[in-house]
Structures are given as structure tokens and as C-alpha cells.
Amino acid sequence: MVKVTAACIIIGDEVLNGKVVDTNSTFFAKYCFDHGIQLKEIATIGDDETQIVDTVRRLVKNYDFIISTGGIGPTHDDITYECMAKSFNLPCELDEECKERMRHKSDPEARLDADALKAHYQMATMPKGTNVKNYYVCDDLWVPICSISHKMYILPGIPQLFARMLKAFTPTLKKIYNLDKDPREYVRYFVRTHLTESQISKELKLIQDESTKVSEAIKIGSYPHFGMGFNTVSILGEKKDDSYLKSIVNRVVNNLEGEVISSELENKFSNQES
């Protein structure tokens, strides 16, 4: 069975100072779950060269598929490409293909002065090397997913672009990591109970300890819903263990006065929707 581990780097001072709410990591977490990828870490860091380089080098050593989002714009604090190049000991150069796509899509030379044009082409100045490959996954966009060593994938921080490009990249991603060959698929069940977390903690620990012996991928979680008068138990694991997972569901229902609910209903509860 193919096992792919992943990590996500959210880059931007605007996230750390509360100016922007990060939604890309949530999207990526769901994306990984849907494609049988084991997301192991999410790092949120600022526009700091040392921090970016250190984080990239650490994650690349430990995981298979690392994405970054943010910091590839035209301003002084957009340093992601430069830092990624440094992380892999590569030069950072103007990419002619990206530059030509910019010209074709928006004709910047006809509408920008020299200083603005230089800043604009900063967005096409990216890592260069034999281990670098740019994937132009959307025909109407000039920005690529920049890949280094089939490990690091650099995406824009704008949520709409991030989501669209990642979705479009899926067929290529499956080929790179052989995700269609004996794929790892995850399933998750939810059980609602009016018992408190203190009342269910002992039973959940017993279930988790027993489940780990079956598969380390099985995770039992408890999620309180403040002011709603109930909690939700999550049972997550691989599809190959579905029969065992369903036995856990029945155990939780019977032992913790629970009822099975859909993921859609659980999402409503999590978002405090009535």
C-alpha cells in the first residue's frame, strides 16, 4: 500500500499578526484526507529568510510531499522563491517561460513603468536547476506550481488560486507518488453523545489503545460542542480496516449512549450552525 506523508508551510507575517485568516491549511488537510495522504505537520511562519530556510530543510528531510503557500508576490516581503532556492542551494533566476506567459496573459510591458515592471517580474524569478520543474496546471494562469526535487511544491497564497491549482495538479500528483497504485484511503465516522468528555475519556482511551494494535492509522477523537449539550466522537482509519472501524462505532454507540451522525451534520455543529 502506498504511504505518502505530507507537510504544509503557511508563509506570511499577515497570518501571524491576524490580518489574514489562513484557510489554505484547512483546504490542504481535507485534500490530503480525500487522497489518502497522511498530513503530518502544518507550519505557520513569517516572512523571515532564516525561518523559511530552516523549516523547509527540516520538513524535506522528514516528509514526502511538502507544499508552501504565500510569499510569491511582487513586494519586498515576498521572499519565498528566493528562500526556497537557498534551501536547496540553487540560484534564483528569471524564468523565461513564466515571463512569456506573463506577457501573453497581461502584457505588463505595455502598462507598467520600469520600477513596477521589475517588481512584476520578481514573481517570475524562481529557483533554477535540473531538479526544478514548473507545472502550469491552469491554461489561463501564468503562475506555475514550482517543484523542487519532487519534494517541495510552491503555490500562491491567494486561497482561490491555491485551491484551484492544487485541484488541477491532482492527476500529476497521483503519477508522481503512485497514488492510484494500491491507494491508501481514509474513512471517518462520527458518533454524538450527551455524556461529557470526562465521562467518556476512560472508554475512549481503552478503544484507542486497542485500535493502535490493529493499525497506527486509527485515531479516536473527542470534540466538544460548547453550549450544545453534547460531544462528538470521531473514529478515523484506513478503508481496509472498515469492518473494525464499524465495530468501534457500534461500541461507542452502545457504551457511551451515542448515535451515529453524518459528516455533514458534524460540520454544521463544528461551525455552530443550527
From Swiss-Prot:
An individual GO BP term: flavin-containing compound metabolic process
SUPFAM superfamilies documented for this protein: Molybdenum cofactor biosynthesis proteins (SSF53218)
GO CC annotation terms, alphabetical: cytoplasm; nucleus
Chain positions found as Phosphoserine: S263
Gene3D superfamilies according to UniProt: MoaB/Mog-like domain
GO molecular function: FAD diphosphatase activity
This protein's UniProt keywords: Phosphoprotein
Misc note: Present with 3890 molecules/cell in log phase SD medium.
Name of the protein in question: Uncharacterized protein YMR178W
Species name: Saccharomyces cerevisiae (strain ATCC 204508 / S288c) (Baker's yeast)
